[in-house]
Regions:
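ATP/NTP-dependent adenylation/nucleotidyl-transfer catalytic domains that generate, transfer
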Residues: 1-27, 33-36, 42-50, 178-301
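ATP-dependent adenylation/nucleotidyltransferase module used to activate substrates
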Residues: 2-179, 188, 192, 201-214, ...
Length: 301
């Protein structure tokens, strides 16, 4: 295998691109894909400071690394979910990454915000763990960005993540979710920051390769609550399709974004309010996070 760029020995083959790259030119390719995502969707500028949500995994730390290398001002946000040793190790990876580069890392503890760590929340509410976790993450990312003055939050969602989410939404025809399936969500209220996904053009394999080549130390273990998650099953289905027809995930996601998503965008305006309990944005009187926190308090007290 020869590198498409220089003709030297390739270290990585990308079947969906019908190309192979040596290590230096793969890193160049990776950074160009991120730059294209940022440019195409006007995600942020060099005048802004970006809050990068990091989990200690390969995707979010790879994203933080790319943004640093490209000269963006950044700060990290780690959400401590309180998931046993997994959270301790993942937090340590984020702290080590930030310390080695002299970067700011903000830490928010879910237990302080919702009243209990995620394992206890799951037991108390009997709702799917990923549901309570996702709700808490979205709320705390937005709140932390507002409190610290960051206009945009960047997450490490990759092509595989986005294709699997879209697959689940289409399979169940969750038409409310489809308009929000986007690499960049604008601020629609003074108390909502922008949310962007600069890695959406890159696969999980590609982010893993970048992290390895850049020597990024990340947590390899999956979240213990991920076992049996529907999203994992969706990824496995798409993996089989990708193996049979390279580029399927890309075509599925990008076809939706380019041609189908506009048809699902809501015509009516959603009226936003400030939660009467916490002041964050909601469509009702009390936000879903405050309802969750209240339920946890009642069932654990």
């Amino acid at each position: 295998m020869k590198c498409r760029k220089c003709g030297g020995t390739a270290s990585l083959e990308l079947r969906r691109h019908n190309a192979a790259f040596c290590s230096p030119h793969f890193i160049e390719f990776f950074r160009k894909q991120v730059a294209e995502a940022v440019h195409r969707h006007h995600m942020f500028t060099t005048d802004e400071t970006i809050m990068v949500a990091v989990s200690g995994g390969k995707d979010s730390l790879a994203l933080w690394d790319v943004l640093i290398e490209d000269g963006y001002r950044t700060a990290g946000l780690y959400l401590d979910l309180g998931i046993f040793d997994y959270s301790k190790e993942s937090r340590a990876k984020c702290e080590a990454f930030a310390a080695a580069r002299g970067l700011t890392l903000h830490v928010e503890r879910v237990a302080e915000a919702v009243g209990a760590p995620i394992p206890v929340v799951q037991q108390a509410t009997r709702r799917p763990t990923c549901s309570a976790c996702g709700l808490s993450k979205r709320y705390l990312m937005n709140r932390a960005a507002l409190e610290h003055g960051y206009p945009v939050v960047a997450t490490g969602h990759n092509l595989d993540d986005e294709a699997a989410t879209l697959f689940g939404s289409v399979m169940h025809w969750q038409t409310d979710a489809l308009p929000r399936q986007s690499p960049a969500l604008a601020s629609t209220h003074p108390k909502l920051v922008r949310r962007v996904k600069p890695l959406y053009r890159l696969s999980e394999l590609e982010t893993a390769a970048y992290a390895f080549l850049r020597g990024i130390d990340y947590i390899v273990e999956e979240c213990p609550f991920a076992k049996g998650a529907t999203s994992i099953a969706h990824k496995q289905v798409l993996d089989r399709l990708e193996e049979a027809s390279p580029g399927s995930k890309h075509n599925f996601l990008f076809g939706f974004l380019d041609r189908a998503r506009p048809a699902f965008e809501r015509v009516e305006n959603v009226e936003l309010h400030e939660c009467t309990s916490c002041g964050q944005v909601t469509t009702g009187a009390v936000c879903a996070f405050c309802k969750l926190a209240d339920l946890v308090k009642r069932r654990t007290s």
